[in-house]
């Protein structure tokens, strides 16, 4: 599979939509990079316009997981919205008191173990934040 690329304008529409709801978040909280990730020590959210094969395979699992765990269907072409919201969820829910334990749990996981990854408390909290945001702002999936 070749890498797919998203339009950063589209990504920032999602970011701006959330900033409009949560003014304590701002564009300076975001940076462009090679993946979707939250840096808790810096309180920075990295967004990416690249969907590679690994992320694509992970999104297939994620689609099933979100439906089974939260009764929410998000199509593959909208999964980037969930990814952004998940990282923003970390911004609002990550407990630095759990940072060392969080890092330990990540180190113990294999790359293919999506189910266990989603069960890590800090990841689950970010998922729940993203799900609640989507359920309360359904039109975000139209971006």
Predicted regions, residues:
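Zn2+-dependent metallopeptidase catalytic core
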Residues: 7-23
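Long, well-structured alpha-helical subdomains associated
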Residues: 2-9, 110-124, 128-143
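Post-HEXXH active-site segment of zinc metalloproteases
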Residues: 78, 94-124
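A short acidic/basic microdomain associated with nuclease active sites
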Residues: 25-33
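Active-site recognition of the HExxH zinc-binding catalytic motif
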Residues: 82-95
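Active-site scaffold of zinc-dependent metalloenzymes
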Residues: 32-78, 94
């Amino acid at each position: 599979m070749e890498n797919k690329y998203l339009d950063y304008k589209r990504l920032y529409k999602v970011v701006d939509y959330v900033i409009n709801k949560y003014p304590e978040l701002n564009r300076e909280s975001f940076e462009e990079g090679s993946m979707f990730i939250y840096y808790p020590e810096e309180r920075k959210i990295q967004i990416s316009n690249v969907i590679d094969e690994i992320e694509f395979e992970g999104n297939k699992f994620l689609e099933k997981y979100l439906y089974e765990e939260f009764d929410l269907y998000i199509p593959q072409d909208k999964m980037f919205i969930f990814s952004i919201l998940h990282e923003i969820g970390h911004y609002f829910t990550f407990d630095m008191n759990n940072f060392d334990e969080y890092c330990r749990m990540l180190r113990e996981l294999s790359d293919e173990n999506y189910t266990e990854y989603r069960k890590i408390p800090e990841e689950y909290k970010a998922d729940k934040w993203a799900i609640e945001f989507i359920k309360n702002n359904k039109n975000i999936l139209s971006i």
